[in-house]
Structure formats: C-alpha cells, structure tokens
C-alpha cells in the first residue's frame, strides 16, 4: 500500500492595510444604507460594499462591520433602504461616514416601506425587505429583497483608490463614428458641459499614469499637493479641498506619517521637509504635463482659460 505524503502548507499572512489598498483598485459606487425600527430608532451608514445578487427574486446585498454600533438597528428593522449617491452628494456621504449623535438633522428625506429614510437627489434608491443575514468573517452580510426601486438616472458618485471620482467616457469610445457624425457635432460639440467633461477625460488619460508612477496613490498625492499649497488651514477644510471621506484621509495621512512625510499637529497636518520635497516632485510632474498640453496656446490664451475656470469654480 502506498503511503500518502501529507504536507502542511502555511497560509500567507495577509496585511489588512495592503489588502484594503489592493481592493481600492476596484471602483465602486457609494451608497448610504438606512433603516428604522418600529420604536423609531433611525440609522444611516455610508457603504461601498453594495452589490446585486439575483434578478428573480430581486435580491441585493451589502456588508457591515461586526463592531459597528449601527448593526443592531439593521438587525432589528424589517426593512432597509439603499440610497445610491449622485456625483453631487459628497458632503452627504461624508456626513454619514462620520460618527454623530443625529446624522439626519437638517437633512431632507422621505419615508419608504418600513419607514426607511430615502434621500432626495440620489442616482437611484432601493427599498428592501430584510431577506437574510449571513456571517462573513469580521462582517455581517445583509441580504435584502427589493420590493420597490426608484431610478432617477443622475450621474453617480464613484469611489476609487481611496478618493471620490466621477464617471467619464472611456477614451477608446470613438464619438466620431459614421452614424454619429451627422447627429452629435452640431449639438454635443457646442455644449459646454460635454466639452468640459471630455477635456478632463483627455487630460487625465495621460496625466494620471505619470502621477501613479511616482509611487503615490491618488489619495496620497492629492493630500501632499493640497497640504503643500496651504489652501486648507484645518482638518475640516482639508476634507473639502481633497474631496475624500474622513476615513480615507485618516488612512492616507497615517501612511504618509509612517513614511516621515507628514506630522499631525492636532488641528491640522503639516508636511515635513521630505514631505514638501515629495509634493514639489508631484508639482513638477503636474506642471510638466500642463506645459506639454498647453504649449500650443499663447500666454494670454492660457491666462484667459485659467480665469474662466476659476470663475466657474467660484475662486
């Protein structure tokens, strides 16, 4: 009889921080999950773990940390709401990502099935009956059966590499196809919003790979550039300037701090000498690309363009 040889294969130790950063390469939408118990306890949490499960029956899922104090209400409530945020709802996302006594204060919302809060101006919303709760490691996976949904069609808020993003057409899409030539140029190519989004897409397509090649992720590079420019005088201002959730700001600042690039002074963050050098390097990359793109325009044309952009932004 042959003796079977058995070997113990050691499992590779997964670094939670590195694992989370790797997962950040998968772009997702941003949702706020809401629920309310029969006694009137209301809860809302920002989540990007939302996904579809089944069409028949219509099932969706999301996950919540077992340590979350909000889980008790989702477990007790018979229904929950999925509010898919639009690109204009970054502040709402940040509000429900933070701990607060009453996140719903001064926020307009309607009540859906089971008295679930449904926010206005979202991209879409799903009213769900709690279907099942499954254990998944350090999270609870909450599955819901969709009983009603609302498709508002607004451009969604995206989340990628620890920062908020927006939808832009892929550069491989050729808008000058034979069938489109006689239809779109006269309308879309005279539309300022369309031209601005296409310009941003074209600019980012070549610029972002150069920035990522520096070794900094989008969230880290954005923080370095904003802090070096000193446009944010406090941590509260910083959140507005970088357009990132508090959790990601904290994670990125922790990484930059561990690299010796940043110091937390309590009310604000300050770059070290090495941090300023890295920010200067990132600015060189940005300025070089800017010069490359705008080389064919005169100084006066560039100045006019910048002034128009600043006027649109309100600065």
UniProtKB/Swiss-Prot annotation:
<dbReference type="Pfam" id="PF01613">
    <property type="entry name" value="Flavin_Reduct"/>
</dbReference>
<dbReference type="InterPro" id="IPR002563">
    <property type="entry name" value="Flavin_Rdtase-like_dom"/>
</dbReference>
<comment type="pathway">
    <text>Aromatic compound metabolism; 4-hydroxyphenylacetate degradation; pyruvate and succinate semialdehyde from 4-hydroxyphenylacetate: step 1/7.</text>
</comment>
<keyword id="KW-0058">Aromatic hydrocarbons catabolism</keyword>
<comment type="function">
    <text>Reductase component of a two-component system that supplies reduced FMN (FMNH2) to the oxygenase component to catalyze the hydroxylation of 4-hydroxyphenylacetic acid, leading to the production of 3,4-dihydroxyphenylacetate (3,4-DHPA). Catalyzes the reduction of free flavins (FMN, FAD and riboflavin) by NADH. Subsequently, the reduced flavins diffuse to the oxygenase component C2.</text>
</comment>
<dbReference type="InterPro" id="IPR050268">
    <property type="entry name" value="NADH-dep_flavin_reductase"/>
</dbReference>
<dbReference type="InterPro" id="IPR036388">
    <property type="entry name" value="WH-like_DNA-bd_sf"/>
</dbReference>
<dbReference type="GO" id="GO:0010181">
    <property type="term" value="F:FMN binding"/>
</dbReference>
<dbReference type="GO" id="GO:0042602">
    <property type="term" value="F:riboflavin reductase (NADPH) activity"/>
</dbReference>
<dbReference type="InterPro" id="IPR036390">
    <property type="entry name" value="WH_DNA-bd_sf"/>
</dbReference>
<keyword id="KW-0520">NAD</keyword>
<keyword id="KW-0274">FAD</keyword>
<keyword id="KW-0288">FMN</keyword>
<dbReference type="InterPro" id="IPR012349">
    <property type="entry name" value="Split_barrel_FMN-bd"/>
</dbReference>
<keyword id="KW-0285">Flavoprotein</keyword>
<dbReference type="GO" id="GO:0036382">
    <property type="term" value="F:flavin reductase (NADH) activity"/>
</dbReference>
<dbReference type="GO" id="GO:0009056">
    <property type="term" value="P:catabolic process"/>
</dbReference>
<comment type="similarity">
    <text>Belongs to the non-flavoprotein flavin reductase family.</text>
</comment>
<comment type="subunit">
    <text>Homodimer. The p-hydroxyphenylacetate 3-hydroxylase (HpaH) is composed of an oxygenase component C2 and a reductase component C1.</text>
</comment>
<keyword id="KW-0560">Oxidoreductase</keyword>
<protein>
    <recommendedName>
        <fullName>p-hydroxyphenylacetate 3-hydroxylase, reductase component</fullName>
        <ecNumber>1.5.1.36</ecNumber>
    </recommendedName>
</protein>
